[in-house]
């Protein structure tokens, strides 16, 4: 997979220390890149969705006290279309992991590969704005 989104993703992560991320996020990023290069499209989608969860929670001090104030910005800094892209990513991940009947891209049809490649590209594109929020200036 050598799409534009993967190239943008690789440029964003190319400089060590450019992103303010923890070890869990770094491991998932490395795995996502390996999966994308190997054309493991389902894995790219799942890794991208996992990255969203980790990026919104890693490093935050979790306080389960109901009186505690919420910490971090989560996804609130994203534009509406960026948030919708993450919602579509989550939906695709759920269709992969939780069987609910036949699903596009998982039918055994010849066109599945092209569909999944496009979905993997969209998954990477969806997480770019969230990663950009982690840039250190």
Give short role names for the model-derived ranges.
Residues 24, 40-47, 85, 92, ...:
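Residue-level detector of well-ordered alpha-helical segments, enriched
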Residues 59-91:
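Short, charged amphipathic alpha-helical segments flanked by flexible coils
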């Amino acid at each position: 997979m050598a799409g534009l989104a993967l190239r943008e993703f690789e440029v964003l992560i190319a400089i060590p220390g450019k992103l303010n991320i923890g070890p869990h996020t770094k491991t998932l990023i490395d795995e996502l890149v390996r999966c994308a290069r190997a054309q493991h499209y389902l894995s790219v989608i799942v890794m991208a969705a996992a990255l969203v969860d980790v990026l919104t929670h890693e490093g935050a001090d979790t306080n389960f006290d109901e009186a505690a104030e919420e910490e971090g910005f989560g996804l609130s800094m994203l534009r509406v279309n960026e948030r919708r892209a993450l919602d579509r990513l989550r939906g695709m991940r759920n269709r992969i992991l939780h069987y609910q009947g036949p699903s596009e891209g998982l039918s055994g049809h010849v066109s599945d590969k092209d569909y999944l490649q496009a979905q993997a590209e969209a998954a990477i594109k969806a997480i770019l704005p969230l990663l950009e929020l982690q840039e250190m200036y």
